[in-house]
Regions:
Chain B
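Internal acidic/polar
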Residues: 78-101, 131
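Short, charged helix-capping/linker segments at alpha-helix termini
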Residues: 1-9, 19-38, 48, 143, ...
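Arg/Lys-rich amphipathic alpha helix in sigma70-family domain 2
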Residues: 49-51, 62-82, 100, 152
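Sigma70-family region 2
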Residues: 38-55, 75
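Short, small-hydrophobic-rich alpha-helical interface motif
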Residues: 18, 22, 32-43, 63, ...
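DNA-recognition helix of helix-turn-helix
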Residues: 58, 65, 69, 139-164
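A short pre-motif secondary-structure segment
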Residues: 121-125
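C-terminal edge and immediately downstream basic/flexible tail or linker adjoining helix-turn-helix-like DNA-binding
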Residues: 5-8, 27, 78-82, 137-140, ...
Length: 122, 165
């Protein structure tokens, strides 16, 4: 036998729950009474907005700086040996990652907060 | 129309339907009333950001289910803190706002023993007779996963009864 049919035949779908007398008559009024006059938005988003813009500016500067540091070798110096650039790059990369971490620590922001700002802003 | 009046009309239209959905999840009238109040409070505070392209009933049902699940977690925490071991069926049979028989109380106990998602899917499908496409929008889960959850839930409930027959 189909298992769903087994449950239906054994128990059925009757609603066995009850409510106090007149509960639904006053429900709308009771709900409306418990609501604040105006919707209460989270204060955090307004308070933290300037911090978010500052963090976004720092990130933009870091990205621009990283792009400048890692521009093609030919543009840096046509006379510099290719081997020297190849050796220098991992060091620069480590250094750039360090800047990101330091900046994130400094701003005391984590990814969840950044996502929250983006969600609030758009 | 004034926003508050508009919201009041919404409360009037959906409160009873939402109450019964919540009640089937949290089981007691007291909890269901608290969860319903919280559901409308959350909806009111987020009313300005509600996407008007979405279905209002889907949005409200989603909030109600999330609030109900939170309530169950709080109850679980309180129950384990108090080391209560009264079964769900016994509690229901002693509840003045439950007029079901022992078999109906057993079904509620079997549903209560399911993991959160299976419990919610079973309630929406079995009692509310909701389409999988609608449940999918509410729970943001694929229809395939929902069908699997429902199938497992039905199987577990059947086994629950057969073990006690």
């Amino acid at each position: 036998m189909n298992e769903e049919m087994y449950i239906q035949e054994k128990v059925g779908k009757r609603n066995p729950f009850r409510v106090p007398e007149g509960y639904f008559d006053n429900l709308t009024a009771q709900v409306m009474q418990n609501l604040p006059e105006q919707p209460e938005r989270r204060a955090k988003s307004v308070f933290m907005r300037p911090v978010f813009y500052a963090a976004a500016s720092v990130c933009a500067l870091l990205v621009a700086g990283a792009a400048w540091m890692w521009r093609p070798a030919a543009e840096v110096s046509s006379t510099a040996p290719v081997q020297a650039n190849a050796v220098a790059q991992p060091q620069q990369q480590e250094s750039a990652e360090g800047y990101f971490d330091e900046a994130a620590d400094y701003m005391m922001l984590d990814n969840h907060e950044i996502y929250a700002y983006l969600a609030d802003s758009y | 129309m004034d926003k508050r009046k508009e919201f009041e009309a919404l409360v009037r239209e959906y409160s009873e339907t939402l109450y019964w959905l919540i009640r089937r999840i949290v089981l007691t009238h007291e909890d269901a009333n608290d969860v319903l109040q919280n559901t409308f409070l959350k909806a009111w505070n987020a009313y300005d950001s509600f996407n008007r392209d979405s279905k209002l009933s889907t949005w409200l049902t989603r909030i109600a289910i999330n609030e109900s699940t939170d309530q169950l977690r709080r109850n679980k925490h309180l129950a384990s803190a108090a080391a209560e071991d009264l079964s769900v069926a016994k509690s229901l049979l002693a509840d003045e706002f439950f007029d079901g028989d022992a078999t109906e109380a057993m079904l509620q106990e079997a549903i209560a023993s399911l993991p959160e998602v299976q419990r919610t899917v079973f309630t929406l499908r079995y009692y509310e007779e909701m389409k999988y496409s609608e449940i999918s929008k509410i729970l943001n889960t694929s229809e395939g996963a929902l069908k699997a959850s429902y199938h497992i839930a039905v199987k577990k409930i059947t086994e629950y009864f057969k073990e006690r027959d």
